């Protein structure tokens, strides 16, 4: 067979065909795959994308907590670089004739306030006390505000205040002189107002304790909103509120609340008739009051923590000004009636007057004695006697032996008197504690009543639509030993408070039980 000669072109064609020959991909599965679903080729050309992360985040050095907590030793010289000469004292002596440097002289110059050049800076320099500083929002006030306070001025003022605020009533003589000065100042005529020079007094009246009405305890009743009825006008509403009463009640669940009673039309006519005839009440008349509102109550008195004394003034024409104490503060807030709980919406308070019993008269006399009490002066006399006895004992010790024995007897007598005085003080403290407890109980009794008057009530009275019965015996203490206090009337409010027509009531509620109450 003749040899076959392969030319260069044929050689290139054969190489080209072999290069395009595809090699089947080997499957990773041992067995033959019958159905295969290979991914299609990417339809886009490859391109470069910017790497958004920091390339040093994997190689950046971070100190560990061990390195952070390590404390390095600070090696310094013992004298901290300051050489102190302990031998020659003239080293640190200052020459008074030395001239200061120009830079140091500027530090000793007084600070002179430069005049403001712009109106805006003048406006920002003003301090308005009723506006809130916006220091956290804007720094304009700090940039334009000119401070008139200097450290030197502050130092001087603080030293001066220390002398003025110093307690000058430490010894007995200074206290006596200060008390006598108050009487001298009270005798000086009042020519003008203490802070308003153009205001002059029209009338000057003395102020005294109200000895006449002090026997009756007064309370301040604060409402969260106007308790006046909505359907009444201004003058009629004031007349009704001047005769109103508050009374403690209880709902079906046993929750206590305060009811606000307003007089009816018939009761208003009776009270107006009594006022025209100059009577406090008619003995046989019955006064009806209908419930208007329900309140939750909060009482504070002298026995309560954080109690602040409160007084009110009564102006009596031609007589002067008298002050009285409000020893109880009652704060009333509107009460929400729960669903399904029946309240005393239609309750009627029936008031009938009676004379005061012996316990009430004794309580009035106790309050009068409390106002007229002069125990502090008696204690001062006891202290003066003890001091004189002590001085006599010292003089006796300087004398003969018999005088020393007499002084010893006097000292023993003074010691026994001191022990008696201490016992009396303890008894007074116990009496004060018991009086505070009695006052708290009396305040609760004023709102929720007591069971002392059960025997005075003959029978229950008919109430409103729901058949509730409530009766009351109203006690008056003005004139014939009776008074009444209206729940909404204030010391300055109605004509009844100025004329001192105040009723002290004891009312029945529920099944005809009689409970005493003072409503203010």
UniProtKB/Swiss-Prot annotation:
GO molecular function: RNA polymerase II complex binding
Keywords: Coiled coil, Nucleus, Transcription, Transcription regulation
Annotated spans, Disordered: 1-23, 359-520
Main location: nucleus
An annotated GO BP: transcription elongation by RNA polymerase II
PANTHER family the UniProt entry points to: RNA POLYMERASE II-ASSOCIATED FACTOR 1 HOMOLOG
Summary of subunit composition and partner proteins: Component of the PAF1 complex, which at least consists of cdc73, paf1, leo1, ctr9 and rtf1. The PAF1 complex interacts with PHF5A.
Identification of the protein by name: RNA polymerase II-associated factor 1 homolog
Naturally occurring in which organism (per UniProt): Xenopus tropicalis (Western clawed frog)
Gene expressing this chain: paf1
């Amino acid at each position: 067979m003749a040899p076959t000669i392969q030319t260069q072109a044929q050689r290139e064609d054969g190489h080209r065909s072999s290069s395009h020959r595809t090699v089947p991909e080997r499957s990773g599965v041992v067995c033959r795959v019958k159905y295969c679903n290979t991914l299609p080729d990417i339809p886009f050309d490859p391109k470069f994308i910017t790497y958004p992360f920091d390339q040093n985040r994997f190689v950046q050095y971070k100190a560990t907590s061990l390195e952070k907590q390590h404390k390095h030793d600070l090696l310094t010289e013992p004298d901290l670089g300051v050489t102190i000469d302990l031998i020659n004292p003239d080293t640190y002596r200052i020459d008074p004739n030395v001239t200061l440097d120009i830079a140091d002289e500027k530090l000793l110059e007084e600070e002179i306030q430069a005049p403001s050049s712009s109106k805006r800076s003048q406006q920002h320099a003003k301090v308005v006390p009723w506006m809130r500083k916006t220091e956290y929002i804007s720094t304009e006030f700090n940039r334009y505000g000119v401070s008139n306070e200097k450290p030197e001025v502050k130092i001087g003022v603080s030293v001066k205040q220390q002398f003025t605020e110093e307690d000058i009533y430490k010894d007995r003589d200074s206290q006596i002189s200060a008390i006598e000065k108050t009487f001298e100042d009270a005798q000086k005529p009042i020519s003008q107002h203490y802070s308003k020079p153009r205001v002059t007094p029209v009338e000057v009246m003395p102020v005294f304790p109200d000895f006449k009405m002090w026997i009756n305890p007064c309370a301040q009743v604060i409402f969260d909103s106007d308790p006046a009825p909505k359907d009444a006008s201004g003058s009629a509403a004031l007349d009704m509120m001047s005769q109103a009463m508050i009374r403690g009640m209880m709902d079906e669940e046993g929750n206590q609340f305060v009811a606000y009673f307003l007089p009816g039309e018939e009761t208003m006519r009776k009270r107006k008739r009594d006022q025209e005839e100059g009577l406090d009440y008619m003995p046989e008349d019955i006064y009806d009051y209908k419930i208007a509102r329900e309140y939750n109550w909060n009482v504070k008195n002298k026995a309560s923590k954080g109690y602040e004394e409160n007084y009110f003034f009564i102006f009596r024409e031609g007589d002067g000004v008298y002050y009285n104490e409000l020893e109880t503060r009652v704060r009333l807030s509107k009460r929400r009636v729960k669903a399904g709980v029946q309240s005393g919406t239609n309750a009627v308070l029936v008031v009938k007057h009676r004379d005061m019993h012996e316990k009430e008269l004794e309580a009035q006399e106790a309050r009068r004695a409390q106002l007229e009490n002069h125990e502090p002066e008696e204690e001062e006399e006891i202290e003066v006697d003890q001091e004189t006895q002590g001085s006599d004992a010292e003089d006796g010790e300087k004398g003969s032996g018999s005088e020393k024995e007499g002084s010893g007897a006097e000292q023993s007598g003074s010691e026994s008197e001191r022990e008696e005085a201490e016992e009396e003080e303890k008894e007074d403290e116990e009496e004060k504690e018991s009086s505070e407890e009695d006052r708290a109980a009396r305040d609760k009794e004023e709102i929720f009543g007591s069971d002392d008057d059960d025997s005075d009530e003959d029978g229950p009275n008919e109430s409103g639509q729901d058949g509730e019965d409530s009766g009351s015996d109203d006690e008056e203490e003005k004139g014939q030993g009776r008074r009444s206090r209206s729940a909404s009337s204030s010391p300055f409010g109605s004509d009844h408070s100025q004329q001192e027509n105040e009723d002290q009531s004891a009312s029945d509620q529920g099944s005809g039980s009689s409970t005493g109450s003072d409503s203010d």
